[in-house]
A protein has these predicted regions:
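Conserved acetyl-CoA-binding loop-helix of GNAT-fold acetyltransferases
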Residues: 84-103
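Glycine-rich phosphate/pyrophosphate-binding loop shared by adenosine-nucleotide-utilizing enzymes
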Residues: 48-64
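Conserved acetyl-CoA binding element of GNAT-fold acetyltransferases
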Residues: 68, 72-86
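Alpha-helix boundary/N-cap detector
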Residues: 3, 7, 93, 119-122, ...
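Protein-protein interaction and targeting regions used for scaffolding, dimerization, and localization
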Residues: 1-16
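Terminal substrate-recognition subdomain of acyl/acetyltransferases
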Residues: 16-38, 59, 63-73, 103-212
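A short helix-loop-beta-strand connector motif used in the catalytic cores of GNAT acetyltransferases and
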Residues: 34-53, 134
Length: 212
C-alpha cells in the first residue's frame, strides 16, 4: 500500500508536466501516422526529429499504438499500446495524446493485450480510478480466453462472456484472466479508454503539436 501511494504521488508529479514545460524546454510532440490506424507519438524538435537520451534535452519518449489484429479481437475498434517509454516525468502527456488520437480515429485506447508490466498496470489503474476526464468501457472475453481458462488453468476456471450476442467488444483478456481468474473484468486492463482532445487542443494553441 505504501508503494502504491508513493507511485500515485509520483504520477501526480508527472502529470504536472504540461504544455508550459514543453515550451520551457523548447520541445514538441509529433504524431506520426504509419499506415491506416497505426501511430508513433514522440517528443521532438521543431523539425519533427525525435529527441533522445543523447540530446542535451532531458525530454524524450515515445508511444506506439496500433489497430488490433485478428488474434486480439475487435476490441471495440480501440487501438492497442504496443510500446511506451519516456524520461521520468514525461510519460503521462504521451499517454494522454495517444488516448485522444485513438478516440478520434477509433474506439479509444487499450493496454497491450499480450504483456503489461506491474508499473504499467498501475498507470491504467490510475486512469480508471483517478482521472475524471477519462472514460472507461468494459471489453469482453474471446472464445480463446474461455477455452484456455477451462483447459489450461489450474484449477480450471469456467468463464462466460458478458455480452454473448455482441462480438465487437471481444478483446483478448489473456493477461487479466491469468492474473484475476473469474474476476478478470475488475482489472483496469480489461477495458478500453476514451478521452476528449483537450491536450491536443492545448498543444495546437501553443504551437507545440506536429502532425505528419
Amino acid at each position: 500500500m505504501k508503494l502504491l501511494r508513493e507511485y500515485i504521488r509520483a504520477l501526480l508529479k508527472e502529470a504536472a508536466m504540461g504544455v508550459d514545460a514543453l515550451v520551457a524546454n523548447d520541445v514538441y510532440i509529433t504524431i506520426d501516422k504509419e499506415g491506416l490506424t497505426d501511430y508513433l507519438i514522440y517528443y521532438s524538435n521543431k523539425d519533427g526529429i525525435p529527441t533522445t537520451m543523447t540530446d542535451k534535452s532531458d525530454v524524450h519518449g515515445e508511444i506506439t499504438i496500433m489497430s488490433p489484429d485478428e488474434e486480439t479481437g475487435p476490441c471495440g475498434e480501440a487501438l492497442n499500446v504496443v510500446y511506451a517509454g519516456a524520461a521520468s516525468g514525461w510519460g503521462p502527456m504521451l499517454y494522454d495524446v495517444a488516448m485522444e488520437v485513438a478516440t478520434q480515429v477509433g474506439g479509444g485506447l487499450t493496454p497491450d493485450r499480450n504483456s503489461v508490466s506491474n508499473s504499467a498496470e498501475n498507470v491504467w489503474n490510475y486512469y480508471l480510478g483517478k482521472r475524471g476526464d477519462v472514460q472507461s468501457h468494459q471489453l469482453d472475453l474471446t472464445d480463446k480466453d474461455i477455452d484456455g481458462a477451462s483447459k489450461y488453468m489450474k484449477p480450471p476456471v469456467q468463464l462466460q462472456k458478458l455480452t454473448p450476442d455482441i462480438d465487437e467488444d471481444d478483446c483478448s483478456q489473456k493477461r487479466t484472466v491469468r492474473a484475476h481468474r473469474d474476476e478478470w473484468d475488475q482489472s483496469s486492463l480489461s477495458k478500453r479508454y476514451t478521452k476528449a482532445p483537450t491536450t491536443m487542443s492545448a498543444l495546437r494553441a501553443a504551437g507545440r503539436l506536429i502532425e505528419k
